[in-house]
Amino acid sequence: MNIAILSGKGGTGKTTVSTNLSTIIGANYIDCDVEEPNGFIFLNPSQIKREEVKVDYPVVDSSRCTLCGDCAKVCQFNALVRTKKEIILFEKLCHGCSACSIACKHSALTFGKRTIGIVEEGKCGNLICKRGVLNVGEPMAVPVIKKLLKNLPQGTNLIDCAPGTSCNVVNSLQYADGAILVTEPSAFGLHDLKMAVQLVRNFNLPFGVIINKYNAENERIQKYCEQEDINILGIIPYRREAAEVYSLGKMIVKLPEYKEIFEEIAKRLREVFPWN
């Protein structure tokens, strides 16, 4: 069972929910927020194994190249530019699709590999923790995410997605059997929750909502969920003591009130999702 945890916007508490819930239900933790992965701060896994993530990029053989420019014309990402003297490659724009090589009539293109990030795997007690880390300055996270999700552990996996509803999240949802949407009771939270709801509905996934940073003065999220017939899996109150524990890199389920809340969320999960 792979459960994706996502949000329409950043800062709603995806990683808070993912890490604490993984310890309560005994699920493996998979951090797909590869541009800013921070789940390991809280789970602190040991026995870390690392593997580089590499992508293809074209290499021009100047002895064969006639500067016809066919490779540049066919590139949909403008990674290749023909000048009077050479073909210039903007390697960070290249998606490694090989269209340029197919278009070249003179076999002047071969492919090399370059490293764009790493995938790490470790242990937190009996749980397996995995994360992808994109190198600073690299624009494309999807190859790292795909590498990370290629061989998921057996059992239940919580997939901590990137914020938003971009292609990074779409690629993560392709491996999911269900989704948890984490939101906050603000105007921006509701706006972006609606986008996330539309996305998971397009994937036809069972899903529910967790309201984080809750205060009783604002019921906009509950009203929206009622109108849309969306399951509310749990409500996590806004408390100073939780923020203090979190700021120290510790799990909020260490607090009795929050442990009880996450145990109730775990029960609701089993009711909403086709658990096996």
Language-model features: where?
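Short, well-ordered beta-strand core segments
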Residues: 4, 27, 157, 179-180
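C-terminal lobe/tail of nucleotide-utilizing enzymes
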Residues: 199-276
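Walker A (P-loop) phosphate-binding motif
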Residues: 1-25
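Short beta-strand-centered segment that lines the nucleotide-binding/catalytic pocket of NTP-utilizing
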Residues: 27-40, 113-118
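Switch II (G3) loop of P-loop NTPases
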Residues: 31-33, 131-136, 145-169
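Inter-motif core of Ras-like GTPase G domains
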Residues: 168-187, 193
